[in-house]
Amino acid sequence: MDTQAFKRSLHHSERYNRRGFGRANEVASNLEKAYQSSLIGSIRDNGYVLQHGRLQVKLAEAFGFCWGVERAVAMAYETRRHYPSERIWITNEIIHNPSVNEHLREMDVLFIHAEGGVKDFSCVNDGDVVILPAFGATVQEMELLHERGCHIIDTTCPWVSKVWHTVEKHKKQEFTSIIHGKVKHEETLATSSFAGTYLVVLDLDEAQLVADYILGQGDRAAFMKRFAKACSANFDPDQDLQRLGVANQTTMLKSETEEIGRLFERTMLRKYGPIELNKHFLSFNTICDATEERQQAMFSLVDEPLDLLVVIGGFNSSNTTHLQEIAISRGIRSFHIDTPERIGDNNSIQHKPLGEDLFIESNFLPAGSVSVGITSGASTPDRVVEHVIQKLIDLTSG
């Protein structure tokens, strides 16, 4: 499929909108009430530090809603204002935050049902309004909705669209796209749908397996078994790993994406030599600025003297998970929660350790003076962070 031609056609349709409806002022008060926080503003103005009795809170200097998320949420609110009585669907969570998605449900925005990773679009009719979330939708979903006569409201983050352009360049030049991402993540599913030949690698370890195979170290059957669900149809590692371009899911850990890019550059240099390198390797910077800022702020925060750290964001949020990884790498007691309600009045916290199930820890706040670092993922509103801080204040004020 010529995805570039399809996008051009879609973008010229009267039933497609990616710029909003000019109703920002009409929804501003709703957004402020639901998501903003005067307390967080005050803490920012005070050098990102709050002292309350024995509790000291240190905020990361970049956290919470990024501009892509703000744009997507605002467009969703504008859509309901513009279509007050029409049926409005969304193909997935608008962002990975439970409170934001619940607000949309309260506005009678309907979520496409999915079972086993397969979405059921049979309920979507001609004339319905369909919102594409911040991390995008597959080109096949867009095509289906367009052919069905839906009004498509595209809130895809421009940084995600940039990655789509990158893999389309790979496809046009007959390069295989190596996508650093999570195979089942909505953004990676969308990105791979715009690619030609592709292979998804989760981390540096998987990238090393690919690099080893390129250099003749590895078994074909074992390779295909490992990556069977992470590659394009009819993928042939002996043919399709000769010309590579690197792209990434925008919320992955920046340092790892960069290292993966360097690994494949070294690998292709070793195999083909410096004169032929550009014929076999392409590299584009598709790391999101907001993701990078939050990760750098987290690295600065974990250098502070902290007793523990609370990371706030959806449990299915990739960028939040990577913030948690940074805390773990420094050996800091850290707790990933998705809502303030995870903190109990009895000084317990229900949190999700990395790669594990939910766990309840008792007496998580120590006695005496305590310094708590706080950060949040790009899909977490300031209002949620405020409520977490208020919970901590209540627990340390008794």
Swiss-Prot record:
This is 4-hydroxy-3-methylbut-2-enyl diphosphate reductase. [4Fe-4S] cluster binds at C66, C157, C288. NCBIfam families: ispH_lytB, PRK13371.1. InterPro entries: LytB/IspH (IPR003451). It catalyses: isopentenyl diphosphate + 2 oxidized [2Fe-2S]-[ferredoxin] + H2O = (2E)-4-hydroxy-3-methylbut-2-enyl diphosphate + 2 reduced [2Fe-2S]-[ferredoxin] + 2 H(+); dimethylallyl diphosphate + 2 oxidized [2Fe-2S]-[ferredoxin] + H2O = (2E)-4-hydroxy-3-methylbut-2-enyl diphosphate + 2 reduced [2Fe-2S]-[ferredoxin] + 2 H(+). It is an enzyme of class 1 (oxidoreductase). Keywords: 4Fe-4S, Iron, Iron-sulfur, Isoprene biosynthesis, Metal-binding, Oxidoreductase.
